[in-house]
Amino acid sequence: MSVINFFPNQLFKRSFVVFAFIGLLASVLCACSPQLDWRTVTSNQAQYTALFPAKPEHLERNLVYQDQDILQVLDAVKIDDAIFSISTIELKKDQASLEDGILESSKNALSQQTDLVKDASVIREANYQTADHQRFAVKDYYFEVKMPNHSQFMRSRWIVRHTPAGEVFIYQVSVLLQNVKSGNVEQMLSQEQYATFFEEFHPL
């Protein structure tokens, strides 16, 4: 599994603009066969298990947030025009106070891109399950980006895990569909192959 460090620190101010982040991945990731080859992936580094439709690429970048060094890792797979990704930000015990600010920045970044995001009003209640079968509520966010000749659809959810040692893991589970000609963002990203990716993400 390769590790690619290609994100300059000056991009941090836009580091939570997920369309830009994942869009950049599209130029790095190779599209796999349309045949979905589901496999369970366990990340000891990011402390989760997930079901990916192919072997994911592993990318890392170092961020500076409020004078604190933070590692962001991303595991992602591109299948045709769909990118399945899990972003993880790990906060050490003495960085835990940054949690709310990072979450707010991450969730607000897309809606702040008013020149791109035309419809970001769909938010749905959902739930996720931890590896030890505890179930918690979560919200799913659906976004549509209008391009001149097509759209991009995105579904994201944010999950926060607090460890007994005081560390905080902030996960963003997302699917981005590129080159969408027509359709409803919520209906399309609720199809089984995308729903499975969200349902089978489990923090350890």
Regions found by a protein language model. Give the residues of each.
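Short acidic, Gly/Pro-enriched loop/turn segments at secondary-structure junctions
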Residues: 62-71, 99
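Bacterial N-terminal signal peptides that target proteins for export
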Residues: 2-21
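C-terminal motif of bacterial Sec signal peptides marking the signal peptidase cleavage site
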Residues: 28-31
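Post-signal peptide N-terminal segment of mature Sec-exported envelope proteins
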Residues: 40-62
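Bacterial signal peptide processing site
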Residues: 33-35
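Short, well-structured beta-strand
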Residues: 73-96, 114-118, 126-204
